[in-house]
Amino acid sequence: MIPDVSQALAWLEKHPQALKGIQRGLERETLRVNADGTLATTGHPEALGSALTHKWITTDFAEALLEFITPVDGDIEHMLTFMRDLHRYTARNMGDERMWPLSMPCYIAEGQDIELAQYGTSNTGRFKTLYREGLKNRYGALMQTISGVHYNFSLPMAFWQAKCGDIAGADAKEKISAGYFRVIRNYYRFGWVIPYLFGASPAICSSFLQGKPTSLPFEKTECGMYYLPYATSLRLSDLGYTNKSQSNLGITFNDLYEYVAGLKQAIKTPSEEYAKIGIEKDGKRLQINSNVLQIENELYAPIRPKRVTRSGESPSDALLRGGIEYIEVRSLDINPFSPIGVDEQQVRFLDLFMVWCALADAPEMSSSELACTRVNWNRVILEGRKPGLTLGIGCETAQFPLPQVGKDLFRDLKRVAQTLDSINGGEAYQKVCDELVACFDNPDLTFSARILRSMIDTGIGGTGKAFAEAYRNLLREEPLEILREEDFVAEREASERRQQEMEAADTEPFAVWLEKHA
């Protein structure tokens, strides 16, 4: 089932320097909660400055949903320490609140008034809040409080030059973009390995079902927790953060222009379903527009091609201008075993897997095959640890045992690891391979199995509160390592100044401005 990567691996072993200079970045979301696990109703902590313009700490959907962002970094340990500093400073500046350590929220009732993230009075800030109003009215606020980790990854120019010859200008844009689309297609085909190893949401609180019927064969504990005994990541299931109305958009990942055309079409295509919500009610705007996507960011995807946008530029226009610059991996649950929601083992694994995805042959993928890849993902998400589980290739009928496919993949990853270790020194990447490959013969080692044992003992709420309390105490005590207190104070002041400047510069009324942007 795994493509034959032997020639590409042999090429890599002859060109190890092609991997020198991998760049990455992390984003981590987490809900602010009270000591009893309920959602914090306070505003964004003052010490964290403006959520609209702060470089490192912002908010996602809700005012209580923090998002930490590291700068681009070539050093894994430095990046993780930077992320830890962001958590340390925040833990010291959020009063008695703490950070929820799980992807799935618990103590939130459907219909509870979850305050949308607030970004001030500038047109840009009001637009961001209106987008969230649209998300709430389309999908419900509860789904939007699910948290995850995003891992951003780019290969060095040396890799593309070694692989594609001496490239520059428009030629480089085309070839590098084609290379990243290969990564994306392989990710759709084999990325289920991420929830298998690192999925950490095998259970949900009963409030999450919102009284809706479900066809999933949930088991229920006395405290009202619903779980699937072999599930890995209910966050990635249809119960979690997905968008069924997008499944027939036909967006594919074979070509830059085709992809962008599909995305631009989706933001122009009217939706009957969303038209029923209305645009405005009693003088209050309910969504930006009633199209399938209000804006491009609404496209749900487990992986995204990205380029840093310029002021006023849409994500797709940035891609058209310069091609794909990096990949955003979006399938990581919060790691409940780490105070910062992600750890070095995961980052090193993702490095290995992304390199493998760039090397492995990846035939073009139709929208129907893309839909077929969802079958493997769903199996792993809902019953990934089930003995005897098999996976298929695309829409073909042949089936392969998951443990065998996993071990075959890791045979290749071990060779990538040897190459990365040869240029970085040490054996850190090989060690990660040795640790993780054991999960295929022993699924009890996976994150989902480990966290489910705790959840069955103490419930999701009990587990979440215990980790949150422990991490709060730990992070508050640890000294900062990279950033200093004065760096945070300076960024707070600078972010507030940037927001004020944006607000002062706006001359158009929001309604007029919105007509141009909706």
From Swiss-Prot:
One annotated GO biological process: glutathione biosynthetic process
Gene3D superfamilies: 3.30.590.20
Catalytic activity: L-cysteine + L-glutamate + ATP = gamma-L-glutamyl-L-cysteine + ADP + phosphate + H(+)
Enzyme class: ligase
KW Ligase (keyword) present: yes
E.C. number(s) listed in UniProt: 6.3.2.2
Any single Pfam family the record assigns to this protein: Glu_cys_ligase
GO cellular component terms, semicolon-separated: cytosol
InterPro entries recorded: Gln_synth/guanido_kin_cat_dom, Glu_cys_ligase, Glut_cys_ligase
Pathway per the UniProt entry: Sulfur metabolism; glutathione biosynthesis; glutathione from L-cysteine and L-glutamate: step 1/2
GO molecular function terms listed in the Swiss-Prot or TrEMBL record: ATP binding; glutamate-cysteine ligase activity; metal ion binding
Keywords: ATP-binding, Glutathione biosynthesis, Ligase, Nucleotide-binding
Similarity section: Belongs to the glutamate--cysteine ligase type 1 family. Type 1 subfamily.
Name listed for the protein in its UniProt record: Glutamate--cysteine ligase
Organism from which the protein derives: Escherichia coli (strain SMS-3-5 / SECEC)
Gene behind this protein: gshA
